[in-house]
Amino acid sequence: MTPEEQLRIIKEGTVEIIEEEELLKKLKEGRPLRVKAGFDPTAPDLHLGHVVLLQKLRQFQQLGHEVFFIIGDFTAMIGDPTGRSQTRPPLSREQVLENAKTYEHQVFKVLIPEKTTVVFNSTWLEELGTKGLIELCAKYTVARMLEREDFSKRFKEGIPIYIHEFIYPLLQAYDSVAIKADVEIGGTDQKFNLLIGRDIQREYGQEPQVCITLPLLVGTDGVRKMSKSYGNYVGITEDPKTMFAKIMSIPDEIMWDWFLLLTDYNKEEIEKMRREMHPMEAKKLLAFTIVKRFHSEEEARKAKEWWEKTFSQREFPEDAPLVKLNEKKLRAVDFLVKIGAVKSKNEARRVIQGGGLKINGEKVTDPNTEIEINGELKVKVGKKKFYRVVSG
């Protein structure tokens, strides 16, 4: 494959390449490029938002390049200030290492193991020492840091910015120096940090990395970026049925971006699907493709059949969990908490008043309705939760 053909493939799904000419020049050198992406293990599981970056890394691997998956065990203890209106609480070493264990296992659901080098940035950052850290800090200015939108906003509003928050992007940049990165990939929110990497590499006498930014995946709500804190995520270790149902719940308008960012279908194939397929069938294909990647073709087939029976044909799932209650009668608001469908009475009220509770096919809209537990009740909560409830 020619360098120009590689560049065309790499550009698909990207927002910006800085600089494109530099990337083409590196590709023309005919050697495997050293491609880097860093992930701070601030939470124990990866979700599809992370997969956008992993998918692009895999693409580089398929083109013959070497991927460095950097687990930011050192930087996670500082906390990335990107997009923050206030200081991020630090994590303990124990929390970070526990989260990192799952990252090591989960990344190979996307990346090719033999073409991936997994490294912890504590390997070189702990060895940097006080002298090395001061030398690193001396290579950048506070004025340049304050050009960043989130820092600038906090500074103008009198919200404290702590010194360690300025140091974070410098340490991320030093990761690029440590592994001699040719390319770094990140979300659009990471652009400032990626560009600092170019500057710091120059300061250490290296050729600057090419920065590739990718879109932030919109979550299942169709509004905000995918995040566990927003509850709009699809975890890559979730069971096949949950994963399939969550994907089927996304708005049609974001489905095509998901195809582009999360699957191996190219733009031409996606455009053809958009013209020729019914949106429902296309979304089933998307859900099937993603579940297959993280589980198996057989599990994806079963999840699809289950979804069609349960949601499309409105059948109650036979394998819904059985919940036994001691009470014979409960108010609806207490009933939802007791069966474990919600965590609080306030949440139960919102679900009920929003029309999200059905018992034996009948909608319950008054939180104070008395529910008699006589025989087996078939309970549906929201779009995806099902329970069989009995007394005794």
From Swiss-Prot:
A motif ('KMSKS' region) lies at residues 225-229. ATP binds at K228. Its EC number is 6.1.1.1. It catalyses: tRNA(Tyr) + L-tyrosine + ATP = L-tyrosyl-tRNA(Tyr) + AMP + diphosphate + H(+). It is found in: Cytoplasm. Belongs to the class-I aminoacyl-tRNA synthetase family. TyrS type 2 subfamily. Catalyzes the attachment of tyrosine to tRNA(Tyr) in a two-step reaction: tyrosine is first activated by ATP to form Tyr-AMP and then transferred to the acceptor end of tRNA(Tyr). This is Tyrosine--tRNA ligase. It comes from Aquifex aeolicus (strain VF5).
